[in-house]
Amino acid sequence: MDIVRSPISTLNHIYDISGVEVGQHFYWQIGGFQVHGQVLITSWIVIAVLLGSATIAVRDPQTIPTGGQNFVEYILEFFRDLTRTQIGEEEYGPWVPFIGTMFLFIFVSNWSGALLPWGILKLPQGELAAPTNDINTTVALALLTSVAYFYAGLAKKGLGYFGKYIQPTPILLPINILEDFTKPLSLSFRLFGNILADELVVAVLVSPVPLVVPIPVMFLGLFTSGIQALIFATLAAAYIGESMEGHH
């Protein structure tokens, strides 16, 4: 009888794992619209962490930086180098805050999904998860990037910016227009897919082996999360730089 039960229990366990879900939604009604409340909650937490950390690190700035101020200046220099490389020496300055904010929000959001036990915070329905675990967040970030590179191109070239759509030949007009729509799609789906996949893998591995296997997977998730933030920020800066350049 035990021999018969063993395969059955194994199959039941596999079935339970196959039903693992990440990011069940907690809905709010705002102005007649249904929004994902858990995304707003976790986003506010991430923003509070960033603002609090920055305030503490630079509350007493010194001429010769030490400690937290030194770390913040190192991060700022990293953002300057990243933005300068992608946008160019003459135009990069105003875009450092935008690229830096994008990177920090995505980086902390991704790491919060890997490090913070969101599941212990109970909601009336649904569950908390990293902000970037929701497609609405990644699409919003991608759309902000789209608005930024359209603004950069129009500010630099005026209406002449739209001339790029018929270069090098007007035949490419549909393809060039389509390219501008695929940029935010690729940014949003790449970030969303990687973060969701990481949390699903951890959730599946925690079920059969809760103590040993998930640890290296979590470290891999932390590394991947950082890489995804860097890729998003780099591509955003590259798109902005491309919009201000002449057609190649």
From Swiss-Prot:
Q: Does the keyword Transport apply?
A: yes
GO function term, MF aspect, one: proton-transporting ATP synthase activity, rotational mechanism
Question: Span of the secretion signal?
Answer: none
SUPFAM superfamilies, per the entry? F1F0 ATP synthase subunit A
Q: Which keywords does this Swiss-Prot/TrEMBL entry list?
A: ATP synthesis, CF(0), Chloroplast, Hydrogen ion transport, Ion transport, Membrane, Plastid, Thylakoid, Transmembrane, Transmembrane helix, Transport
**Origin, by domain of life?**
Eukaryota
**Which residues, by range, are in coiled-coil regions?**
none
**Major localization class:** plastid
Q: Does the keyword Membrane apply?
A: yes
Q: Which CDD domains match?
A: ATP-synt_Fo_a_6
Query: One Pfam match, by short name?
Result: ATP-synt_A
The membrane topology of this protein is:
Multi-pass membrane protein
One GO CC annotation = plasma membrane
**Subunit structure and binding partners:** F-type ATPases have 2 components, CF(1) - the catalytic core - and CF(0) - the membrane proton channel. CF(1) has five subunits: alpha(3), beta(3), gamma(1), delta(1), epsilon(1). CF(0) has four main subunits: a, b, b' and c.
Q: Which PANTHER family match?
A: ATP SYNTHASE SUBUNIT A, CHLOROPLASTIC (PTHR42823:SF3)
**Assigned protein family:** Belongs to the ATPase A chain family.
Which NCBIfam families would you find in this protein's record?
Answer: ATP_synt_6_or_A
Q: What is this protein called?
A: ATP synthase subunit a, chloroplastic
The protein's organism comes out as Pinus koraiensis (Korean pine)
